[in-house]
């Protein structure tokens, strides 16, 4: 669960950065 949450957070950050 922790790993998944961390990965999701990183992906969300990348998406925001791309925007």
From Swiss-Prot:
The modification Sulfotyrosine is found at residue 4. Keywords: Adaptive immunity, Blood coagulation, Coiled coil, Disulfide bond, Hemostasis, Immunity, Innate immunity, Secreted, Sulfation. Conversion of fibrinogen to fibrin is triggered by thrombin, which cleaves fibrinopeptides A and B from alpha and beta chains, and thus exposes the N-terminal polymerization sites responsible for the formation of the soft clot. It is found in: Secreted. GO terms for biological process: adaptive immune response; blood coagulation; innate immune response. GO terms for cellular component: extracellular region. Cleaved by the protease thrombin to yield monomers which, together with fibrinogen alpha (FGA) and fibrinogen gamma (FGG), polymerize to form an insoluble fibrin matrix. Fibrin has a major function in hemostasis as one of the primary components of blood clots. In addition, functions during the early stages of wound repair to stabilize the lesion and guide cell migration during re-epithelialization. Was originally thought to be essential for platelet aggregation, based on in vitro studies using anticoagulated blood. Heterohexamer; disulfide linked. Contains 2 sets of 3 non-identical chains (alpha, beta and gamma). The 2 heterotrimers are in head to head conformation with the N-termini in a small central domain. A long coiled coil structure formed by 3 polypeptide chains connects the central nodule to the C-terminal domains (distal nodules). The long C-terminal ends of the alpha chains fold back, contributing a fourth strand to the coiled coil structure. This is Fibrinogen beta chain.
